[in-house]
Amino acid sequence: MSIFAGKTLMITGGTGSFGNAVLNRFLRTDIGEIRIFSRDEKKQDDMRHEYQAKYPDVANKIKFFIGDVRNLQSCRNAMPGVDYIFHAAALKQVPSCEFFPMEAVKTNVIGTDNVLTAAIEAGVGAVICLSTDKAAYPINAMGITKAVEEKIAVAKSRYSGKTKICCTRYGNVMCSRGSVIPLWIEQIRNGNPVTLTEPKMTRFIMSLEEAVDLVLFAFEHGQNGDILVQKAPACTIQTQAEAVCELFGGKKEDIKVIGIRHGEKMYETLLTNEECAKAEDMGNFYRVPVSYTHLTLPTNSR
């Protein structure tokens, strides 16, 4: 972790599953400060007490900033002294975004623009934006807004000065807040049917640890404007549900199909065909480089 030695890292949306995974990975390293930026004071207070109990000797490295990525001045207020940013703040529930698409625009699109604008103004060293495989050939409001988030990050990278901007694109992060596996576990423990939307639906899956690994890979190896994607395995929703039943004592015959929810795709895609054509294979990851060709190209090539 020497690259983070004595540095200040800010995590937007930092009270979520990703922020917790980063704290557990970094707190006992030589990092200087981890700044949690989010709008929910109750979650911040819960996190403060949790980490004071869990890591009493290093919990003072965590600093909490109440603010909203939707507000540019709020982002600016949190920036002084920040060296790096992991931008995780997002609306990510597909059905909710379908019903309230402008709320998704405000957080995922305008919020990203605000974070990047404030970061560039403050001379932050690097910003890693967390995206989703739903941004590849998007069909729902969440995916569309995350696709625009990626476009904003790429566009900002062209004029970002000393600030490196990269995106990471995820599949489904298992056991993250709002994901289906915690719901299934709760259903099994309560003796209720295990509900799934469509047995043949496929999803790319990764762990929270892998989510942090991907961001660190982008931080260390990504170039300005890159999109970094992990080569995640895929499986059907039926297979996932049966595995959870086996692990937590549920019965496969109790699985109940409830139908596809608003905005959901049958099959996700990690990369578009166009991205595949230019992607660089980096072992466990793909790197999709940005094109810095200017809009004002000559009309002839004499």
Residue ranges and their predicted role:
Residues S38, I66, K106:
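Conserved residues in the N-terminal Rossmann fold of short-chain dehydrogenase/reductase
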